[in-house]
A protein has these predicted regions:
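Catalytic cores of nucleotide-sugar-dependent glycosyltransferases that transfer UDP/GDP/TDP-activated
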Residues: 1-304
Length: 304
């Protein structure tokens, strides 16, 4: 992704999506090239894919920018560099699959006679990108897919969205039936993920909470830490899937408290794969994944 190299954790769920997608396609004997920022690493299950890395100026996450902000269209932008590299490889390929939420790869669909397929990773976070999705989708409706209906609803001009959910390599997760560990929260530590609500709940019921994920906003994390006694929050950092599932599987429950329209909610499925029940806000993808009272519990959004 343009905000961080693969294996850094900065790309959030997109990194897991890419790993699962590439691994699945390789198992079906497809030839795969992956273009990513320099220092990227692929997971072991994707090792037979060809990895091409490029350098360029990174950008901030769209959810942390003003809705009316303009795209960085400089020649040195990492998005443009990745797109340029991908286009140089097309003579041996059938299609480009774009996982970035950015203007250039989407607009390029109108400019070249080669299929560029877009798996949109976020809801409507940018007017400029929403407008280009609308324009390109009207010409190439089958070139776009979304993770959930809740996410696709952010784009009302798309009347019949293609919903693909997400894929998971379940062999990477160990199902643990009995556990009496602490509560868990997993995700990028940033305001839109709503960690403060999960910590509040844990504190109110006298429980400790393990927090896994890259700290994207240091001030936000520090403010949450300041509000609660030392030891109530156990910061675990970002871990690869094999290490995450070991610790997550020992927890009693995962609390999922997104403040935005979560496109899917990979961590919800990851917790389920470990045998950990999930309590989540009924918002975005988690509201579709969880069957209330059967595979987890849903509560009114923001009702901590």
């Amino acid at each position: 992704t343009p905000i961080g190299f693969l294996s850094s954790g900065r790309g959030g769920g997109v990194e897991l999506t890419l790993s699962s997608l590439v691994s699945g396609l390789l198992k079906q004997n497809h030839f795969i090239n992956v273009v990513a920022p320099i220092n990227s690493r692929l997971s072991e299950s994707c090792s037979s894919a060809n990895l091409f890395t490029v350098e360029g100026s990174q950008q901030n996450s769209w959810q942390h920018q003003d809705y009316y902000s303009k795209t960085n269209n400089s020649d040195d932008s990492i998005v443009n560099k990745m797109l340029e590299k991908a286009l140089s490889l097309i003579k041996d390929c059938d299609a480009i699959i774009n996982l970035s939420y950015d203007l250039e790869p989407i607009s390029k669909t109108l400019e070249i006679d080669f299929p560029i397929l877009h798996l949109i990773s976020m809801g409507d976070e940018s007017l400029e990108i929403s407008n280009i999705i609308s324009k390109v989708h009207s010409n190439f409706p089958h070139n776009f897919a979304f993770h959930s209906r809740a996410q696709a609803s952010d784009y009302p001009f798309i009347k019949d969205p293609i919903i693909v959910g997400n894929g998971f390599e379940l062999s990477k997760y160990t199902y643990q039936e009995k556990k009496d560990g602490p509560l868990a929260w997993v995700g990028r530590v940033a305001p839109e993920k709503g960690l403060e609500d999960a910590v509040y709940v844990a504190s109110e019921i006298g429980e400790k909470i393990n927090v896994w994920g890259i700290i994207e906003d240091e001030n936000y994390a520090s403010e949450i830490s300041r509000l609660y006694p030392a030891g109530e929050i156990c910061w675990k950092g970002f871990l690869p899937t094999n290490k995450l599932q070991e610790g997550l599987g020992q927890c009693r429950a995962l609390i999922n408290t997104p403040k935005w329209n979560e496109a899917y909610g990979n961590v919800v499925v990851e917790a389920m794969a470990c045998g950990v029940p999930v309590v989540a806000y009924k918002r975005g993808g988690p509201g579709e994944i969880i069957q209330h009272g059967e595979t987890g519990f849903l509560v009114k959004a923001d009702d901590k």
